[in-house]
Amino acid sequence: MEFSAQQIAGFLNGTIEGDPNVKVSNFSKIEEGKPGTLTFLANLKYAHHIYNTEASIVLVNNDFKPEQPIRATLVKVENAYAALAMLLNLVEQSKSKKKGVDSTAFIAASATVSDDCYVGNFAYIGEGVKMGKNCMVYPHAYIGDHVTVGDNCVFYPHATVYENCIIGNNCILHAGSVVGADGFGFAPEGETYKKIPQLGNVIIEDDVEIGANTTIDRAVMDSTIIHRGVKLDNLVQIAHNVEVGENTVMAAQVGIAGSVKVGKHCMFGGQVGLAGHIHVADHVVFGAQAGVISDVKEATTLLGAPAINAKNFMRSSAIFNRLPDIYRSLGQMQREIEQLKKEINKQ
């Protein structure tokens, strides 16, 4: 597909600086731009590339002011990154989608699957499954008995949904993700551990995306709940009975222990860990590798392990880096004090 700068600006409600008739048919990074491609500048850290890029069109924020001439045509918008996402979604939606059921797929007789869905080779859809419209189940995906799936969902290869779980509308489960496996529940019995049956389920609300090899465990009796708009990166672990609030995002290798309640609009950097049974307020930000062992009662940014307020962490880090010098100074002070004591004792 090919679009002119004029068409793109019209779609994005943007303005043009340059040739409105220049056309593009692909995307590129700003530092690797080629003629016929569109790129963007959202982070001014990369602003120096805009003067050398060979891309034909660059999306920029309305407040961007060039410091020297630019060869590319600029399309100015309110938010360049959000505008790029809109264009990428437009291209994605224009792609033809597979439909129908491949010959080696299995769909149980009691399952209800809309005629406009795609079910790939060796995919499995169990008894009593109810699947909405326009879903895509790629080869080797598994949807267990009595699972309910909304409209416009995508299950990539080897995505697994255990029995009785509920998936909302517009959800994406990437390859190897597992929804509804048993929670890590064992009762000590002498020197061994006895398994506690996990009889609950997982509820995934609308517009949730689950990354590759991410796991969300079923609850003991009720539901593990991932609320609307949550985005989980690859290799995230959500334990049983957890509740994750709306529009919270988690980067790779985050681990949430059992019965944690996470608020709305929280942000988790990579490898953050939360201890079990704690509550997190709305709008909390966790820096990478933060270790959280107690409730977070108000919106804040936390760093470190155990996690503390970001400003205090930065001050502590600055002091930590100076510890060798402080240690040497302290040693010198101690020696001087001892010398003074000796001189005083002589008097």
Swiss-Prot record:
Family to which this protein belongs: Belongs to the transferase hexapeptide repeat family. LpxD subfamily.
Record's catalysed reaction(s): a UDP-3-O-[(3R)-3-hydroxyacyl]-alpha-D-glucosamine + a (3R)-hydroxyacyl-[ACP] = a UDP-2-N,3-O-bis[(3R)-3-hydroxyacyl]-alpha-D-glucosamine + holo-[ACP] + H(+)
Gene3D superfamilies (UniProt xref): Hexapeptide repeat proteins, MurE/MurF, N-terminal domain
Pathway the protein acts in: Bacterial outer membrane biogenesis; LPS lipid A biosynthesis
GO biological processes: lipid A biosynthetic process
Protein name: UDP-3-O-acylglucosamine N-acyltransferase
Keyword Lipid metabolism on entry: yes
This protein's GO CC annotations: membrane
Subunit structure: Homotrimer.
Signal peptide, first to last residue: none
Record EC number: 2.3.1.191
GO molecular function: N-acyltransferase activity
Active site residues according to the UniProt entry: 240 (proton acceptor)
Cited PANTHER family: UDP-3-O-ACYLGLUCOSAMINE N-ACYLTRANSFERASE, UDP-3-O-ACYLGLUCOSAMINE N-ACYLTRANSFERASE 1, MITOCHONDRIAL-RELATED
Species name: Parabacteroides distasonis (strain ATCC 8503 / DSM 20701 / CIP 104284 / JCM 5825 / NCTC 11152)
Disulfide bridges in this chain: none
Gene name tied to this protein: lpxD
Biological role stated in the UniProt entry: Catalyzes the N-acylation of UDP-3-O-acylglucosamine using 3-hydroxyacyl-ACP as the acyl donor. Is involved in the biosynthesis of lipid A, a phosphorylated glycolipid that anchors the lipopolysaccharide to the outer membrane of the cell.
NCBIfam families named among the record's database cross-references: lipid_A_lpxD, PRK00892.1
Annotated keywords: Acyltransferase, Lipid A biosynthesis, Lipid biosynthesis, Lipid metabolism, Repeat, Transferase
Record carries keyword Transferase: yes
